[in-house]
């Protein structure tokens, strides 16, 4: 019904001071400081929508908006 719904998913990697493993999340050029051990990943991921839950949220939101309008 809603097609291919996608949303941005943000993941933050902070490996400052971590010596347990080699950090391979970032493969670009090094900055030469603490920033070399941090990375932010943004990816669009498919999401599943529970139609019954979505309908309930919509109903509650509309009810709240109508109550505020009075």
From Swiss-Prot:
Other facts noted in the record for this chain: The light-harvesting system in Cryptophytes contains phycobiliprotein complexes. Unusually they are composed of either phycoerythrin (CPE) or phycocyanin (CPC) but never allophycocyanin (APC), with only one type of biliprotein being present in any one species. Unlike cyanobacteria or red algae these proteins are not arranged into higher-order phycobilisome complexes, and they are found in the thylakoid lumen.
Entry comment on modification after translation: Contains one phycocyanobilin chromophore, one mesobiliverdin chromophore and one 15,16-dihydrobiliverdin chromophore with binding mediated by both the alpha and beta subunits.
List of residues binding mesobiliverdin: 18, 26, 41
Segments passing through the bilayer: none
Keyword terms: Bile pigment, Chloroplast, Chromophore, Electron transport, Membrane, Photosynthesis, Plastid, Thylakoid, Transport
SUPFAM superfamilies linked: Non-globular alpha+beta subunits of globular proteins (SSF56568)
Name of protein: Phycocyanin-645 alpha-2 chain
